[in-house]
A protein has these predicted regions:
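Sec-dependent N-terminal signal peptides
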Residues: 19-26
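Structured domain cores in non-transmembrane regions
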Residues: 69-148
Length: 231
């Protein structure tokens, strides 16, 4: 699909065509324009805020679970690679995902007391199969560790073009207890705030076909916000 960035990278470009095939097939059956609307896949997200013994935040440990359909396609593609087993394919895929995400700031924005924070480079990561889902785990460091006491840290994780939707892990229609966690000091209140996009932006996303790219930054308006407020 021309012009659509995907974190899985160029090594799996063929996978993008599956979204087109699925959309066209369903659309021809249901005659629904919504099938072609963005987003075309999703990631279930969970985040652990990493702090040291002094209660200083050093980064975010993120776990991404790709949606079941996309996961199935990825596993089938990897198993067809000759001379390589699934785990070897996943190891290479993890490297590809990391390299492609680095060009997009790992789909992550972090603010402390409203001030944007510079991010470090990801060196710890892994891709694996878990319960039939492609799961990518990585530690995203802050370029400068930040004390949390008396401050508020917020983050958003989103695909800038909104081709993929990123949502925190849910349970009974609300963020699960494991969607955002922080162990140790300081004492903080954790919450996940829902997105509240302008109706015009919702319509804009709905009008985008599967082979079209939303303007950069569109995904920010649909992003949930993780908030850590510390005493």
């Amino acid at each position: 699909v021309t012009g659509v960035f995907h974190p899985l990278g160029s090594s799996l470009n063929k996978l993008r065509s599956y979204w087109v095939v699925l959309a066209i097939g369903v659309c021809s059956t249901l005659n629904s324009s919504l099938v072609l609307a963005h987003p075309h896949g999703w990631i279930d997200l969970s985040v652990r805020v990493i702090t040291n013994d002094e209660g200083i935040a050093t980064g975010l440990h993120q776990t991404w679970r790709m949606d079941p359909f996309y996961s199935l396609v990825v596993f089938e593609e990897l198993q067809q690679v000759q001379g390589s087993n699934l785990q070897e394919g996943l190891d290479q895929l993890g490297s590809d995902i990391r390299d492609n995400l680095s060009q997009q700031h790992y789909f992550t924005e972090i603010r402390v007391n409203g001030e944007p924070q510079a991010l470090g480079e990801v060196s710890e990561y892994t891709a694996l199969e878990r319960d039939g889902r492609l799961t990518f785990m990585f530690i995203l460091p802050l370029a400068t560790p930040q004390p949390l006491a008396g401050r508020m840290l917020e983050y958003q994780v989103f695909d800038p073009t909104y081709y993929i939707e990123v949502v925190h892990e849910e349970e009974d229609g609300a963020p699960s207890e494991q969607a955002l966690i922080l162990y140790g000091e300081p004492d903080c209140r954790l919450s996940v705030l829902p997105a509240d996009p302008d109706p015009e932006l919702v319509m804009q996303a709905a009008l985008l076909d599967v082979d079209e790219t939303g303007e950069s930054g569109l995904g920010r308006h649909f992003a949930e916000t993780g908030r850590i407020e510390c005493d």
